[in-house]
UniProtKB/Swiss-Prot annotation:
Catalyzes the reversible conversion of 2-phosphoglycerate (2-PG) into phosphoenolpyruvate (PEP). It is essential for the degradation of carbohydrates via glycolysis. This is Enolase. PANTHER family: ENOLASE (PTHR11902:SF1). The active site is at E205, K334. Keywords: Cytoplasm, Glycolysis, Lyase, Magnesium, Metal-binding, Secreted. Pathway: Carbohydrate degradation; glycolysis; pyruvate from D-glyceraldehyde 3-phosphate: step 4/5. It comes from the Archaea. It comes from Saccharolobus islandicus (strain Y.N.15.51 / Yellowstone #2). SUPFAM superfamilies: Enolase C-terminal domain-like (SSF51604), Enolase N-terminal domain-like (SSF54826).
Amino acid sequence: MINRFSIEKVKGLEIIDSRGNPTIRVFVRTNDGVESFGDAPAGASKGTREAIEVRDENGLTVKRAVDIANYIIDPALHGIDVREQGIIDKILIDIDSTENKSKLGGNTIIATSIAALKTASKALGLEVFKYIAGPRLPKIPIPLLNIINGGLHAGNKLKIQEFIILPIKFNTFKEAFFAAIEVYRNLKGLISERYGKIYTAVGDEGGFSPPLEETREALDLIYTSINNAGYQGKIYMGMDPAASDFYDPKKEKYIIDGKELNPTQLLEFYLDLAKEYPIVYLEDPFEENSFDMFGELQNKLNSTIVIGDDLYTTNIKYLKIGIEKRSTKGVVVKPNQVGTISETFEFTNLARRNSIKLVTSHRSGETEDNFIAEFAVGIESDFIKTGAPARGERTSKYNKLLEIENKFGLEYGGKYFYL
């Protein structure tokens, strides 16, 4: 039955992301003229099981994705109630009919799915996070700030992709976030002093990429910056090795810090680091099929949360394996990895039922849209990972969280977080 919530138009638009690469924005409009949009982000380091993007000319355009939105998705969703997220996403999945979303494109599908959700919340006069959360009052997640970059995110010799700080022991998000900024500023000064001002330029996610070669060099810089800022015992450390990127499958070895390590040696390497530094977060420490090694490491690191990103790719099929093997205490949530909001909800609900912590994450290729911040609050994610406190496409998410806390008085999750 056609009503004011019925979808009247779906329209695609080619835009650019924060790396200057093309991506797709999809608009969804109701019969009442209410309209919103969804943007498709893109990762630099991708799991092999992620939804496939539709791109043309060696990735230089997304014209085909725009055509798919305009000529296939538009008529398919015409007249559907925009509040029916499950029905909308099922139609998209059925039309695509592939396991990896390669027909319509994961980018086209997720942009449409996000646009539908945002339009529905707007039509109902609700904030996006409130529309997702329902009657419960969620908490603001703990931010994971990626302040030193390595791996595929940088041009230095560091193999670890992200070195992270976590401001945990604070009463409010604002307090926590601005304390983290103090550490970021201290780090900038330290890098400038030791390596030269040229190395304080920021990378794709707003972090620094000083000319470092070994993991401990980066950890020492961050540890010193935390202490200099006076936040020892309140701001902790984490890493995202993205280990698939420095794994040699032929040798079955990990190439890191000038050494070739087998999985057991790499595990010992992480255990040593956890003894030396206040590391409470470790994401993708092994290559993406190593469910057992993830579990062994998690079992030995009681005070550190081992997280699966490429291990799961926000896919319930792989999460079930991880649950059975007790691989991790946490999962990364990236809606564009699986392709629809409904499938993302299935994933987060299963994780929650099994007491697994949620880490809602941006991608390295982002836009200025702050949807992922609202999404993180709405699902009451334990953490949010959206880069350093620099670059507009990163700060837009943090500013949205500050606004939500100020306007709605939500409590900060870090206040209740115990290691």
